[in-house]
C-alpha cells in the first residue's frame, strides 16, 4: 500500500502537517477548497521560476493568510517589497477577500522533493539527457543531507516511439514506515515529443513519537553500563 498511496497524505497528522489549515462550516467547505486551489495554481504559474516548494493557506473568520515557501524569495519580494504588494492585490482580486502574504525561504532546496522534480523537468525541457538530469538531482540531494532518494520519469523518453517508465534509487526510501519523513513531489516537462511526468521521493530520516529525529535520540540516550564479570572461584 505504501508503494501506491501518496506518501504525504499517508503521513498527515503523524509527521506531516496540512497545507490548508482552517475549520469551516460544512456549507462553506467546497467554496474554500476551490479558493485554495485557485490561489495555489496562480502562485505556481506566476512565480514558477522563484522555486515554489510549498503554499500554505490559513483562514480566520474574515482574513486569509497565504505563506509561500520559495527557494528564491527575492524574485517574489522585488525592490522594497513592491512585487509582494502586487501579488497580494492580485490574490485578493482573484478570491474576493482580504489576503495577507508571507514569504519564507526554503533553506535546503536540494532536499525538497517538489523543487527537485521541477529541476528535472526544466532540464528535460532544455533537452538534457533524462538519465543525466536524474543523476544530477540525486547527487545534489544526497550531498544536501538526504538519507535516500528515488526519481521516476515516464513518457516518451529520449524521443522513443513507445512511452516507458524509468526510475533510479539511491540510499533508503522506506515508504511503508509511517515514522519516516518522506517528501514527495511531482512535475511535468513539456517537450517536443510530448509530456513527461517526473516523481521524486526523498527520505529525510525517521521521527519518534515525541517528534525527535532518531539520530538525536540515539545521541541523548546513554548506553547501559555492563556489569563487571564475576570471578569464578578455584
From Swiss-Prot:
Alphabetical list of InterPro entries matching this protein: KH_dom, KH_dom-like_a/b, KH_dom_type_2, KH_sf_prok-type, Ribosomal_S3_C_sf, Ribosomal_uS3_bac-typ, Ribosomal_uS3_C, Ribosomal_uS3_CS
Compositionally biased residues, Basic residues: 223-234
Gene3D superfamilies: 3.30.300.20, Ribosomal protein S3, C-terminal domain (3.30.1140.32)
GO molecular function list: mRNA binding; rRNA binding; structural constituent of ribosome
Keywords: Ribonucleoprotein, Ribosomal protein, RNA-binding, rRNA-binding
Keyword rRNA-binding: yes
PROSITE patterns recorded: KH_TYPE_2 (PS50823), RIBOSOMAL_S3 (PS00548)
SUPFAM superfamilies: Prokaryotic type KH domain (KH-domain type II) (SSF54814), Ribosomal protein S3 C-terminal domain (SSF54821)
SMART domains: KH
Keyword Hydrolase tagged: no
Domain KH type-2, chain residue ranges per copy: 39-107
Pfam families cross-referenced by the UniProt entry: KH_2, Ribosomal_S3_C
GO cellular component terms given for this protein: cytosolic small ribosomal subunit
Biased composition, class Basic and acidic residues, residue ranges: 213-222
Subunit structure, as described in the record: Part of the 30S ribosomal subunit. Forms a tight complex with proteins S10 and S14.
Functional note: Binds the lower part of the 30S subunit head. Binds mRNA in the 70S ribosome, positioning it for translation.
Family, similarity comment: Belongs to the universal ribosomal protein uS3 family.
UniProt xrefs under PANTHER family: 30S/40S RIBOSOMAL PROTEIN S3 (PTHR11760), SMALL RIBOSOMAL SUBUNIT PROTEIN US3C (PTHR11760:SF19)
Name of the protein in question: Small ribosomal subunit protein uS3
Gene name as annotated: rpsC
Amino acid at each position: 500500500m505504501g508503494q501506491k498511496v501518496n506518501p504525504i497524505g499517508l503521513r498527515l497528522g503523524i509527521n506531516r502537517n496540512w497545507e490548508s489549515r482552517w475549520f469551516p462550516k460544512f456549507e462553506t467547505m467546497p467554496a474554500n477548497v476551490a479558493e485554495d486551489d485557485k490561489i495555489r495554481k496562480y502562485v505556481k504559474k506566476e512565480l514558477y521560476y522563484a522555486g515554489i516548494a510549498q503554499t500554505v493557506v490559513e483562514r480566520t473568520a474574515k482574513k486569509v493568510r497565504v505563506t509561500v515557501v520559495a527557494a528564491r524569495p527575492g524574485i517574489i519580494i522585488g525592490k522594497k517589497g513592491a512585487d509582494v504588494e502586487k501579488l497580494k492585490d492580485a490574490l485578493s482580486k482573484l478570491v474576493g477577500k482580504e489576503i495577507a502574504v508571507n514569504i519564507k525561504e526554503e533553506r535546503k532546496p536540494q532536499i525538497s522533493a517538489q523543487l527537485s522534480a521541477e529541476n528535472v523537468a526544466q532540464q528535460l525541457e532544455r533537452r538534457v539527457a533524462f538519465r543525466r538530469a536524474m543523476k544530477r538531482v540525486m547527487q545534489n540531494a544526497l550531498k544536501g543531507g538526504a538519507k535516500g532518494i528515488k526519481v521516476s520519469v515516464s513518457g516518451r523518453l529520449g524521443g522513443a516511439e513507445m512511452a516507458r517508465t524509468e526510475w533510479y534509487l539511491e540510499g533508503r526510501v522506506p515508504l511503508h514506515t509511517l515514522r519516516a519523513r518522506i517528501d514527495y513531489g511531482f512535475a511535468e516537462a513539456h517537450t517536443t515529443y510530448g509530456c513527461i511526468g517526473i516523481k521524486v521521493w526523498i527520505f529525510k530520516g525517521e521521527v519518534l513519537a515525541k517528534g525527535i529525529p532518531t539520530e538525536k535520540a540515539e545521541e541523548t540516550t546513554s548506553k547501559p553500563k555492563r556489569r563487571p564479570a564475576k570471578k569464578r572461584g578455584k
